[in-house]
Structures are given as structure tokens and as C-alpha cells.
């Protein structure tokens, strides 16, 4: 974090403190006062003309941060020279403005105003580089650990977790006012004196904000008189300062550190223990610590300062802050990677469990299939045994049947000759039946032809009937018109009457033709019945001839057809059957004639047809 970013963080608090309505805008008069004070503390020459020119406007309304930032960057921050001003004065100016509005400790305040200011500076130093400024819980824990180390006490993690578990902290992090409220509550410093807390805050403030790597008393050997004098040393990244006492009022000198400097441990001599020396290009400084631990800490701190100079870094804690941020990012990446890996492992575990379940199902199905196969195999064996037993029984029966068949074969041979003779007789009979069937087919074809002619005549009769109905409707219309135009339509009525008579005459002719066709159909049906009677007669004879002759039957010597008797006309059964068929024909003819009479009866005396 560079100097401009540090200054902007402090100035941001001052700007937001002037924003009374929290609208993001500040009045121009207040911005002028703020700018004038910044000129003073930053040791920048005042440019009243530029200030008035930038804020010159007919409108006296407020100015937003976007409107103030160009002026702040161009006329103030761009002219800042590091080392020409005391940054603590800038922080005090901004703290004074923001504390008046926002810092109101409730009840008995534990922190003095100076400690609250130092905590505010520490918060700005360790806050994230985004606005509004917040400090993440990890940095808060790091800062509290530094305080506890300075006070040589253990951090109260229970109280810290209570503060961190708050919803606002979990979502957004610690604001500076939440942080100061936590420190003012006294829960983290319970049982510790206020003076001890203040000293710890000052020590941590000087270490982090003031870039003090190490402070303490050391014995220093003089360059001229070579005597040993106890001095208060303050180590910064580029300088080792020493004073008469720890109040740092009497500055006795400083040692510039660069890449050519080095520190070495010296053996004890001249009655001094824990000695070490700091070598520069021009001088060698011999120093003595109080104990070995202090010597180790000082040598390590000086080597760290030299390393920072070589690496071009001006602050140890800025470097540590960046490293912690990188570590957090790495931890976050590792956590995300671990979560992804866990998700992948869970997916693989679920897939494995699913496959195991499928495998179990397959095994269960395989076991069931194996059981079914065993059952099928057992059933097949039983069926095979039953089939084998049945085949043995059938084989025995076949042997017995073959023996009986061989005995019967001789009889069958004799019977076969008789059957062949009988077959020849049946073939002759079949030929006669086929002739009779052909006659029946011809009679049916004639009947179909007569029926077709009858249907055609019926269609013509229906068409003429429709025409007659149409003429009748026209006649009725003409009769109605005759009431209005009797003289004009009389001739037309006569012509229509003649046409009607002609249609009636044609209808009578059609009926006569239909009657003749009906007579032909009746004759054809009579022939068909006669042919059917002949076919039935020959079928009876053929069925009698198809009756097989048993092995034990005796035949008379009267010839092959001695058992076959042709029915005569005097047979009572045959006469009864013919009589019933003739009665059926007469009843059908009576029904047809009755239908014709009913049709004739429907015609009126004037030639019109009655509609049922």
C-alpha cells in the first residue's frame, strides 16, 4: 500500500464525517476548510486561486466525492512529497473530524482518546483496499494477538468468537466503530490495568504504523573514548536511531543501514557479555545486549532491516500484510479446491454407492436367476424322467400295437380291395353329383340375372314415381295459381293432366313388366329348388355309399349295391318333405301377390298415388 492510498483512507473518513445527511455530498464551504487544513498538515504551498477556481460556481449546493476527487488528486495528493510532513498529523486531523461525529463511547470508556486514535490508525493500516473500509476477522485476530504478546497475556478467544459471530461482522467484516466498541467493552482486556493496555497499544502502534522493528536498551562502545554507554535504540527499516533514554527526547545519533551493512556476533570481552557488532562501509559499531535472547532478537531484527532495504521495501508490516493476504487467498483457493475435490469425491462416492447398489441388485438378480435355473433344471429333469417313463409305456404299447397291427394287416389287405372297388363306384357317383351341381350353379346364375333385371325395373319405377310426385307437386302449384290466373293456366293444366296420364300408363307398363319378371324369378327359384332337391338326393345316396364295411359284416350275394336302396316316390318321408316345400312356395307366392295388390290399391281413381 503506497503513501497515496494511506492518505486517501484517512481523508475518506474526514469526508464521510462532513457528510451529515449521508447522501455522498458535502457542502463546498466545509470542503474548502478541509482542503486548507490538508495544505497545512501536508506542508504544501497554499493555492487560494486554484481552490477558489475549482469551487467557483453560482450554485452553493454540496459536492460529491466524485466532484472532489479530481481536485484532491491534482492539487493536493500529486504535490505530496514523502518525508516533508508528519503523517501522524494528517491522521490526527482526519481523526478529529470523524471522531466528533462517529466516536461516542457509551458509559465508562476504557480507552483514552490517544489510544482510540492509535487503534483507528492501526485499523486503517490493516483494513482492506476497498470502500467502505473494513477489516476482516483474521486481521483483527492478528492485531489482538500482537496486543496480547505486548502485554504477555493469552488472547480470550471465547469473547473474540462472540464478536466475530455477529451477523454484520460475518457478512461485511469489522468497521472501525465496531472494532473500537469491542475494545471499549473491556471483555478482551478483563483483569488488565489500563496503563498496561495503553502501553501495549502504543508499542504495537509504533511497531506497525511507525515501522519500528525493535526498541530497547543496548550498551554502545564509543568511537573516540572507547567507553561503554547505555543507550535507547530504535530500529527502523533503513535507520538505527539511539537516544539517551526511552522518552526519545535527546537524540544522540543514527546509523544508516544499506546493503553493505552486516551484523556479527562477538565473543565476550572487556567485562561485557552478549556482544555483537554492526559493520557499515565507514564504521563498526560494537553493541552489548542484556542477555543472549536479546542479542538474538537484535541481530535478527537488524538483518531483517537490511533485507528490506535490499529488496526495496520500506515497511516490514506492509510486506507481512501482503504476505498474509496472499496466504489468505492461497488458503481460499485451497479451500475452494478442497471443496471441489470433496464435491468430486462425494460425487464419486455417490457414483460408487450407486454402482455398488446396482452391483448388489445384479448379484441379487443373478442369485434369483441361478435359483430359477436350478428350479428349471430340476423341473426339466422331472419332465425328462416323466417323458422317459411315458416313452417306455408308449414303446410297450407300440410293440403291442405292432403285434396287433400285423395281425390286422392281412384283414386290411382284403378290405382294401373291397374299398378300391367301392371308391370307383363313389367316383362315378361324384361325377353325377358334379353334373347336378353345375345345373344348380347355372340355375343360380339365371336367378341372379332375373334379380338384376327386377332391380333395374324397380329403379326405373322409383324414378318414374319420383317424376310422378314432382308432376303432382307442380299440379298442386298450378291449382293454387289457377285461383288467381284461372283462364291463363287452364291449358297448362290440361297438358299436365295428359302428361300425368301418360306417366300413369308408363307406370302400369312398368308394373306389368315387373310382374313378368317376378314370374320368371319364381320359375327360376322353382328350378333351383328342384336342383337342390336332386343334390340332396344324391348326397344321401353318396353318404350311404361312404359308410365303411366292418370286418365282421356279411354281404349278400346280390351285388355291390345290395345294401343301397334308391328312395321311391312312394316313400312317405320323401312325400312329406316335398309337400312341405310346395307349401312354402305357395305361401311365398301368396305374399308376393298380396304385396302387388296392396301397391295397386294405393292408387286412387284419378291416377294419383296415396302416400302412407
UniProtKB/Swiss-Prot annotation:
InterPro entries associated with the record: EF-hand-dom_pair, PH-like_dom_sf, PH_domain
Residue ranges, annotated region (Disordered): 546-612
Biased segments, Basic and acidic residues type: 572-581, 588-603
CDD domains recorded: PH_SWAP-70
PROSITE patterns named among the record's database cross-references: PH_DOMAIN (PS50003)
Domain PH, residue spans: 211-307
Transmembrane segments: none
Cellular-component GO terms for this entry: cytoplasm; nucleus
GO BP of this protein: cell migration involved in gastrulation; convergent extension; convergent extension involved in gastrulation
Organism, as annotated: Danio rerio (Zebrafish)
Official protein name in the record: Differentially expressed in FDCP 6 homolog
Lineage: superkingdom: Eukaryota
Pfam families per UniProt: PH
Amino acid at each position: 500500500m503506497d503513501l497515496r492510498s494511506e492518505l486517501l483512507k484517512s481523508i475518506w473518513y474526514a469526508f464521510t464525517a462532513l457528510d451529515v445527511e449521508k447522501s455522498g455530498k458535502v457542502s463546498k464551504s466545509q470542503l474548502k476548510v478541509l482542503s486548507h487544513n490538508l495544505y497545512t498538515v501536508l506542508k504544501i504551498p497554499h493555492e487560494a486561486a486554484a481552490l477558489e477556481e475549482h469551487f467557483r460556481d453560482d450554485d452553493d449546493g454540496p459536492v460529491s466525492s466524485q466532484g472532489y476527487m479530481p481536485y484532491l488528486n491534482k492539487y493536493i495528493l500529486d504535490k505530496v512529497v514523502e518525508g516533508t510532513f508528519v503523517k501522524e498529523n494528517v491522521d490526527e486531523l482526519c481523526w478529529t473530524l470523524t471522531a466528533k461525529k462517529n466516536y461516542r463511547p457509551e458509559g465508562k470508556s476504557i480507552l483514552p482518546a490517544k489510544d482510540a486514535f492509535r487503534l483507528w490508525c492501526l485499523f486503517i493500516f490493516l483494513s482492506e483496499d476497498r470502500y467502505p473500509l473494513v477489516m476482516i476477522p483474521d486481521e483483527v485476530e492478528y492485531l489482538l494477538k500482537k496486543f496480547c504478546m505486548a502485554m504477555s497475556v493469552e488472547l480470550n478467544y471465547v469473547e473474540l468468537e462472540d464478536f466475530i459471530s455477529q451477523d454484520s461482522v460475518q457478512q461485511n467484516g469489522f468497521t472501525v466503530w465496531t472494532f473500537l466498541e469491542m475494545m471499549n467493552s473491556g471483555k478482551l482486556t478483563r483483569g488488565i490495568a489500563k496503563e498496561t493496555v495503553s502501553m501495549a497499544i502504543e508499542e504495537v502502534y509504533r511497531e506497525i504504523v511507525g515501522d519500528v522493528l525493535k526498541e530497547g536498551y543496548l550498551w554502545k562502545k564509543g568511537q573516540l573514548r572507547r567507553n561503554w554507554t547505555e543507550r535507547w535504540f530504535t530500529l527502523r527499516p533503513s535507520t538505527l536511531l539511539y537516544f539517551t533514554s526511552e522518552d526519545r527526547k535527546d537524540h544522540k545519533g543514527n546509523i544508516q543501514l544499506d546493503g553493505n551493512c552486516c551484523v556479527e556476533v562477538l565473543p565476550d570481552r572487556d567485562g561485557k557479555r552478549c556482544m555483537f557488532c554492526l559493520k557499515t562501509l565507514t564504521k563498526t559499531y560494537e553493541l552489548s545486549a542484556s542477555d543472549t535472547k536479546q542479542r538474538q532478537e537484535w541481530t535478527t531484527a537488524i538483518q531483517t532491516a537490511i533485507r528490506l532495504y535490499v529488496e526495496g521495501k520500506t515497511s516490514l508490516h506492509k510486506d507481512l500484510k501482503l504476505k498474509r493476504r496472499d496466504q489468505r487467498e492461497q488458503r481460499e483457493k485451497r479451500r475452494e479446491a478442497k471443496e471441489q475435490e470433496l464435491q468430486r469425491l462425494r460425487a464419486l462416492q455417490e457414483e460408487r454407492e450407486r454402482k455398488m447398489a446396482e452391483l448388489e441388485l445384479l448379484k441379487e438378480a443373478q442369485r434369483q436367476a441361478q435359483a430359477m435355473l436350478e428350479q428349471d433344471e430340476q423341473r426339466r429333469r422331472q419332465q425328462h424322467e416323466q417323458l422317459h417313463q411315458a416313452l417306455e409305456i408308449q414303446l410297450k404299447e407300440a410293440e403291442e400295437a405292432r403285434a396287433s397291427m400285423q395281425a390286422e394287416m392281412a384283414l386290411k389287405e382284403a378290405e382294401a380291395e373291397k374299398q378300391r372297388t367301392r371308391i370307383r363306384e363313389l367316383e362315378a357317383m361324384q361325377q353325377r353329383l358334379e353334373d347336378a351341381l353345375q345345373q344348380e350353379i347355372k340355375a343360380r346364375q339365371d336367378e341372379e340375372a332375373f334379380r338384376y333385371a327386377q332391380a333395374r325395373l324397380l329403379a326405373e319405377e322409383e324414378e318414374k314415381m319420383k317424376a310422378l310426385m314432382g308432376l303432382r307437386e307442380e299440379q298442386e302449384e298450378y291449382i293454387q295459381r289457377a285461383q288467381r290466373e284461372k283462364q291463363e293456366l287452364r291449358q297448362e293444366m290440361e297438358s299436365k293432366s295428359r302428361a300425368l296420364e301418360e306417366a300413369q300408363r308408363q307406370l302400369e307398363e312398368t308394373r306389368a313388366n315387373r310382374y313378368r319378371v317376378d314370374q320368371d324369378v319364381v320359375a327360376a327359384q322353382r328350378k333351383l329348388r328342384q336342383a337342390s332337391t336332386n343334390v340332396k338326393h344324391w348326397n344321401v345316396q353318396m353318404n350311404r355309399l361312404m359308410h365303411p364295411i366292418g370286418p365282421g359284416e356279411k354281404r349278400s350275394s346280390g351285388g355291390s349295391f345290395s345294401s343301397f336302396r334308391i328312395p321311391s316316390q312312394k316313400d312317405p318321408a320323401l312325400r312329406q318333405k316335398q309337400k312341405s316345400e310346395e307349401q312354402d312356395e305357395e305361401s311365398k307366392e301368396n305374399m308376393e301377390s298380396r304385396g302387388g295388390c296392396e301397391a295397386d290399391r294405393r292408387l286412387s281413381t284419378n291416377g294419383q298415388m296415396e302416400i302412407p
